[in-house]
């Protein structure tokens, strides 16, 4: 029998701090086959190219980062693009600015999944629309993953309780809101991550005056399945 504390640690794992010699700080949250990293990159800092067996996806939350995947380098500004580094593909980054950069990276290796990417490894915004009245969302899509940036309006804006076949992970990147998974509720603040497995009931409500913002990742895509199928057909 799991205690309330056990359930909270399952759905909202306590992040562990990783400090690197170059000054980069990362807060790591893990459930199962997936790790969420919230990274703080100091000004004029280089993250040397490296590779690993996991796929890695990411985006910049604050600031500007020069990101290299394979032999492709692109400047990434906050929430304007995402990258995919497939398994064993070298990737690194450099903060060339005078400001600290905050980025989110997700590492994953799950049996049965195939990790495709665009030829240049970077995803542009696919579309922006209202998911619910007043809740604007922006999507980045590849055939096995969908990234959704969501604004939850203040003063009671909510994502009603629901469940689906997709695995869902989310990170609060602005404001705050209450997130509940299978009856376990946590106050989401900047950097808090949640992990929701398929068919686990979940919902969110913003009781604050200001809008909140979150990054939500779906495996496989939930809202843009047709786009994903077209990408899959193109690859085959």
From Swiss-Prot:
Cofactor(s) this protein requires: Fe(2+); Co(2+)
Cytoplasm keyword on record: yes
Location in the cell: Cytoplasm
Origin: domain of life: Bacteria
Positions with a binding annotation for a divalent metal cation 1: 50, 52, 56, 91
Biological or metabolic pathway of the protein: Antibiotic biosynthesis; bacilysin biosynthesis
Cited SUPFAM superfamilies: RmlC-like cupins
EC number: 5.3.3.19
Alphabetical list of Pfam families matching this protein: Cupin_2 (PF07883)
Residues involved in substrate binding: 223
Protein keywords: Antibiotic biosynthesis, Cobalt, Cytoplasm, Iron, Isomerase, Metal-binding
Catalytic function, reaction form: 3-[(4R)-4-hydroxycyclohexa-1,5-dien-1-yl]-2-oxopropanoate = 3-[(1E,4R)-4-hydroxycyclohex-2-en-1-ylidene]pyruvate
Binding-site residues for a divalent metal cation 2, renumbered to this chain: 162, 164, 168, 202
GO annotation terms (biological process): antibiotic biosynthetic process
Cofactor note: Binds 2 Fe(2+) or Co(2+) ions per subunit.
GO molecular function, one term: cobalt ion binding
Domain Cupin type-1: 40-106, 151-215
UniProt keyword Iron present: yes
GO CC aspect terms: cytoplasm
Function: Part of the bacABCDEF operon responsible for the biosynthesis of the nonribosomally synthesized dipeptide antibiotic bacilysin, composed of L-alanine and L-anticapsin. Bacilysin is an irreversible inactivator of the glutaminase domain of glucosamine synthetase. BacB catalyzes the allylic isomerization of the endocyclic-delta(4),delta(8)-7R-dihydro-hydroxyphenylpyruvate (en-H2HPP) to generate a mixture of 3E,7R- and 3Z, 7R-olefins of the exocyclic-delta(3),delta(5)-dihydro-hydroxyphenylpyruvate (ex-H2HPP).
Quaternary organization: Monomer.
Protein name: H2HPP isomerase
Gene name as annotated: bacB
């Amino acid at each position: 029998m799991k205690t309330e504390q056990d359930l909270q640690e399952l759905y909202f794992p306590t992040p562990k701090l990783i400090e690197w010699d170059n000054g980069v700080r990362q807060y790591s949250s893990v459930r199962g086959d997936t790790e969420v990293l919230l990274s703080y990159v100091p000004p004029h800092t280089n993250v040397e190219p490296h590779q690993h067996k996991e796929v890695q996806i990411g985006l910049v939350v604050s600031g500007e980062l020069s990101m290299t995947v394979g032999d492709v380098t692109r400047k990434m500004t906050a929430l304007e693009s995402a990258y995919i580094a497939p398994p064993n593909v070298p990737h690194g980054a450099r903060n060339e600015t005078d400001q600290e950069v905050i980025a989110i990276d997700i590492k994953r290796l799950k049996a049965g999944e195939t990790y495709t990417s665009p030829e240049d490894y970077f995803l542009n915004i696919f579309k922006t629309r209202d998911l619910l009245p007043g809740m604007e969302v922006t999507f980045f899509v590849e055939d096995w993953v969908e990234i959704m940036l969501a604004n939850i309006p203040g003063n009671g804006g909510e994502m009603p309780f629901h469940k689906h076949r997709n695995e869902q992970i989310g990170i609060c990147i602005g404001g705050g809101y209450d997130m509940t998974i299978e009856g376990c509720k946590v106050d989401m603040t900047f950097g808090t991550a949640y992990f929701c497995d398929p068919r686990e009931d979940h919902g969110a409500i913003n009781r604050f005056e200001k809008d909140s913002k979150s990054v939500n990742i779906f495996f496989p895509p939930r809202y843009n399945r047709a786009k994903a199928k077209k990408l899959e057909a193109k690859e085959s």
